[in-house]
Each structure stands twice: as C-alpha cells, then as structure tokens.
From Swiss-Prot:
It holds the Pfam family ATP-synt_ab. Gene3D superfamilies: 2.40.30.20, ATP synthase alpha/beta chain, C-terminal domain, P-loop containing nucleotide triphosphate hydrolases. This is ATP synthase subunit alpha. It is found in: Cell inner membrane. F-type ATPases have 2 components, CF(1) - the catalytic core - and CF(0) - the membrane proton channel. CF(1) has five subunits: alpha(3), beta(3), gamma(1), delta(1), epsilon(1). CF(0) has three main subunits: a(1), b(2) and c(9-12). The alpha and beta chains form an alternating ring which encloses part of the gamma chain. CF(1) is attached to CF(0) by a central stalk formed by the gamma and epsilon chains, while a peripheral stalk is formed by the delta and b chains.
Length: 513
C-alpha cells in the first residue's frame, strides 16, 4: 500500500491538531522532619497560609508556619508512614468540608467524614472552614427569641437568634446539659442545630447522640466530633468545620444554632500545635494569637439581613433574614473566670451564663448564678409575655440575695423583709428544672405569673415544684386553648392576665398537688 504525499501531509496535520502538550506545574518539596504530627518541608515556595499540602499515603497537611526556607504543617490524619525525604506537593486549595441538608441527623468528624456507620453523606456541596464574617452593613439587629425552654435562662438571661452567649463554669456542673436541652427545645421551630464536641470521650459523645435520638432532636442536628483520641489538629479545626456547616443555613435565610463544647479544649489543642511549631509562648504558654483564634470563629455567628441572603443566593431567596446563634462553652478551673481564655471569650461574646459549683451542690439545677450572668442583646429579642412576667423574678432574686446575707446577722426582721426572703426562697425553688423537661412559652409564663403575683408565698418551699407540676397538668388538659393561644401569639395583655389568673386560682382551689 502506497500513500500519496497529500495524504501523508493530511495525516501529519491531523496529528499536529490533536497533539496536546499541556504542562502541569506542581510545587514540590521535600520533608526534612516529621514528629508529633508536625512536618517540616523544604522547597515549597508557592504555598499559602492555610493551604492543603499533599503528603504521602493520601494524607493532607495544613500549612501553618511559612518560614524563609521551610514550611511547618500539621498533619490531618495518621503520620506514622511519613518519613524524612518523602515528597510533598502544593494543592492550591484551602481546607473545605461538606455542607448541606444531607448532614442533618449524621455524626461526622472534623473533616466532614461520616463516623456513625450510616454510609456516605449524600452531598456534593463543600465550603471552606475559614471564612470572613459578614460585615456591619450585612448584619441585622437581634430581635427574635431563641427559646431554650429553661426558666432561669429565658426569663433572666434571654438569648436571641444571631447572638453569641457563653456558657461558663467548672467541670461536671451542667454546661452540656443546658446546651443539649436547648437543642431538644428547637424541635419543630425550624432551627437547625450543630453540636461540636471537642476533646471529649467517645462514650460521652455517643451518650449525647442517644439522648438527642430519644427526644427526636437528631433529625434537625449535625454532630461534629473531634474526640480526645483525635489529633490536636482535628480538635483545632473542628469548630471552624461546624461553623461552616451552620453558615450554609444562615446564608440561605434559615436559622441555625451551634454549640461549641468546649472552646477551652480547642485552645489547649492550638497551644500544643503552636508550641510544636516553635512559636513563641505568651501568657499561660498560649501563643500570641489565641484571642484571634476565638474571635474569628465567634464573629461568624450573626443575624444577616434580607439583602445579604438575596445576594448570596443570587435572588433565589428574597425577604428572609438568616441567623447563626452560637453557644460557646468554656470550662473554668475552680471558678476562676479571670484566667486567659475565659476573659478572652467573655469579651468576644454578647453575654454569659455563669454556672457555680456551690449552687449545683446545694441542689439548684441548672446552677445559674443570676448575679454574674448577663445577656447584652437578648432583652430586645425576648418574647413579650416572658419579658413582662420575668422582670419581677429578677427583682425578687436580687432582693433575696441582698437580704439573705444580711439576715444571717439580724435576729429580728420586720414583716416586709421576711416577706421578701420568703418569696426569694420560693422563686429560687421554682427555677429548679430537671434535664430534658423544657417548657413551652405558655407553661413558663404560667409559672412566672404564679410567682410574680404571690401565689407561691403561702406554700411550703417543698410544695413549690409539686404545685408547678399540677398547674402545668391542669393547664394542658382543661385550659389547652389558652396555652395554644399564648404559644401562638406570645402577647401579654389584661385578657391574657385574667386567663392566667383563672388557671392558677383553679389549681390553688383544687389542692391536688
């Protein structure tokens, strides 16, 4: 077979047209040391801060230290197979985690990989773990309540959607219990919840998952778990990963709640990483940027306006505001709230719920100290009826605390002082609440009305809780229409006050407790 010159030239032209001489440039470095989850890489010239670095064995590192001639990176995973002399490559990407509705009801690790044995997460959406918080122009003031269902919080330290409210106290005094109750109370409200467990035992996290499933709260909750057995790197990035998952809902005009349990352990993990990276230590051996560690995380919790949501969704969602409410938890040592990390987070957040060991041991649970606890913006978001009825509760407790210390020295007290002490004791008893027994707005208002109007004054202290239980049972059976009306409107006027009075007096007359 003989080809003509024209056919040969045609074939050559075709081959030239199809020839693809693409050159892929990769920045390559050499690992010069690996120890304690930290790799030092020489020769990565184009790496950026926070970039993912491809390491041997399908493992990635996070570039944290950019030196003149080397890069310090923390390994996100197992590093025992990595050795000196191995190659490392830039990826040009920063760390992203999966986001979206498909994550609801799932337990994932800090990188978004499922760890609950229910298969892969069915989402293609991802989001960077580090994002700039919305600016002032895109924010809206906090004016919608986020009901926790806990009397002492909703009446005295109200939380609004888009607020950052710190829960602070020693270990084992009910910080997580408050957060879990708040998540359970969001059932049916449309608020999506993210619970970030940092440095906790796997058994503790499994117990929380079981509790949320038992009370039907898991279907609106994502759990991000960086257990005590996970590396410091995963404990450090877990809150940022959880925040990105929450921002997915915020940016689409929905409401979300995120619990960081707890940021003390994240600060410990970051301190460990920083010391291993040879960063200069400061107060309590923390690095200089530990304030920025928490501020850049908590500033991402916000209420955003309609324009922000419309711009983010390219006009798909209009006329809706979004919010991400944060409940960071800080563990103190022997009640010392003046330590480095507690003071940092107190200054960043919009208020704090302070739990005290002495109150917990005396039987007051939740062990909230109303004197040290404050909500800086939640008052504007409080439901009308709770705001009206809760004012008297705070006043009664303030007077009680003042007189309680004085009464220990005074032998004969006048009638008015004795009445204030009696009411204070009964209000304190009323604020006791068992875990997993959150209240609706109407039932809470009923309890506060009874206390505010002196219906508890002639009861024994031991009768207060049984009376409240009987009052709620009566209201839910005989006066369910009133309860439904209050829950729907949350208004407080003379008509509602009269209806509450009828219910309380009916219960007092029955004496069925």
């Amino acid at each position: 077979m003989q080809l003509s010159p024209s056919e040969i030239s045609g074939l050559i032209k075709q081959r030239i047209e199809k020839f693809d001489n693409s050159v892929e440039l990769k920045s390559e470095g050499t690992i010069v040391s690996v120890a304690d989850g930290i790799v030092t890489i020489y020769g990565l010239n184009d790496v950026t801060a926070g970039e993912m670095i491809k390491l041997p064995g399908d493992v990635y590192g996070l570039a944290l230290n950019l030196n003149t001639d080397s890069v310090g990176a923390v390994v996100l995973g197992d590093y025992e197979h990595i050795k000196e002399g191995d190659k490392a490559y830039c990826t040009g990407r920063i760390l992203e985690v999966p986001v979206g509705e498909a994550l609801l009801g799932r337990v994932v690790d800090a990188l978004g990989n499922p760890i609950d044995g229910k298969g892969e997460v069915a989402t293609d959406l991802t989001s960077p773990i580090e994002k700039i918080a919305p600016g002032v122009i895109w924010r809206k003031s906090v004016d919608q309540a986020l009901q926790t269902g806990i009397k002492s919080i909703d009446s005295m330290v109200p939380i609004g959607r888009g607020q950052r409210e710190l829960i602070i106290g020693d270990r084992q005094i009910g910080k997580t219990a408050i957060a879990v109750d708040t998540i359970i109370n969001q059932k049916g409200t449309g608020v999506k919840c993210i619970y970030v467990a940092i440095g906790q035992k796997a058994s503790t996290i499994a117990n929380i998952v079981r509790q949320l499933e038992e009370y039907g709260a898991m279907e609106h909750t994502i759990i991000v778990a960086a257990t005590a057995s996970d590396s410091a790197a995963l404990q450090y990035i877990a809150p940022y990963a959880g925040c990105s998952m929450g921002e997915y809902f915020r940016d689409r005009g929905q409401d979300a709640l995120i619990v960081y349990d707890d940021l003390t352990k994240q600060a410990w993990a970051y301190r460990q990483i920083s010391l291993l990276l040879r960063r200069p230590p400061g107060r309590e051996a923390y690095p200089g940027d530990v304030f920025y560690l928490h501020s850049r995380l908590l500033e991402r919790a916000a209420r955003v306006n309609e324009e922000y949501v419309e711009k983010f969704t390219n006009g798909e969602v209009k006329g809706k505001t979004g919010s991400l409410t944060a409940l960071p938890i800080i563990e103190t040592q022997a009640g010392d709230i003046s330590a480095f990390v507690p003071t940092n987070v107190i200054s960043i957040t919009d208020g704090q719920i302070f739990l005290e060991t002495d109150l917990f041991n005396s039987g007051l649970r939740p062990a909230i100290n109303p004197g040290n606890s404050v909500s800086r913006v939640g008052g504007a978001a409080q439901t009308k009826i709770i705001k009206k009825l809760g004012g008297g509760i705070r006043l009664a407790l303030a007077q009680y605390r003042e007189l309680e210390a004085f009464s220990q020295f005074a032998s004969d007290l006048d009638e008015a002082t004795r009445a204030q002490l009696n009411r204070g004791q009964r209000v304190t008893e009323l604020l006791k609440q068992k875990q997993f027994s959150t209240l609706s707005v109407a039932l809470m208002a009923l309890s506060l009305y009874a206390a505010d109007n002196g219906y508890l004054d002639n009861l024994e202290v031991s009768e207060v809780i049984p009376f409240e239980s009987a009052l709620h049972a009566l209201a839910e059976t005989k006066y369910s229409d009133v309860i439904a009306e209050i829950n729907e409107t949350d208004k407080y006027d003379a008509d509602i006050a009269d209806k509450l009075k009828i219910i309380v007096e009916d219960c007092k007359a029955n004496q069925a407790w």
